[in-house]
């Protein structure tokens, strides 16, 4: 009669340990895959949120410069939205679309200017000191570091030297589209009563 050799205790323990090690390795891989997928999902959601929200926001009242009873220039104060570090406002990275009563302009933007050389931040001072040859909308950065990026703590003034003046009750719309984030849209109506000259708040 043949004798059958059974598995002794030490061999069973070795097999069991091997199974445990393999199971632990598989669990580790599965856990890592899950964490990686979760992280990627968070990144996609964050990018989607950034694209859906504007990187810029209006920082105060929109100002109009009035000459001979009509608005000939507009200044929109803007800043970086909370949670953003900076927005590149270079002429090749930003588009400024303007809707006037008489015409729509696909892109009136001509770039960034440093406001540190100006004597003050009045709209009349800016328009008399800065010449924009490739368009009539430009950004002046105050408290900046000399580059084209609008950063936290810096003040931006988007100036529009209108090709045709605006009169009372007329409406305009400005859409600022940086390379990232949703567009910033500003709409205003010229007040019914305008002085012959000076600055007027449009709210």
Curated annotation (Swiss-Prot):
It comes from the Archaea. InterPro entries: Flagellin/pilin_N_arc, Flagellin_arc. One of its GO terms (cellular component) is archaeal-type flagellum. This is Probable flagellin 1. It comes from Aeropyrum pernix (strain ATCC 700893 / DSM 11879 / JCM 9820 / NBRC 100138 / K1). One of its GO terms (molecular function) is structural molecule activity. It is found in: Archaeal flagellum. Residues 1-6 form a propeptide. PANTHER family: FLAGELLIN B1 (PTHR35903:SF1). Belongs to the archaeal flagellin family. NCBIfam families: arch_flag_Nterm. Its main location: other. Flagellin is the subunit protein which polymerizes to form the filaments of archaeal flagella. One of its GO terms (biological process) is archaeal or bacterial-type flagellum-dependent cell motility. Keywords: Archaeal flagellum.
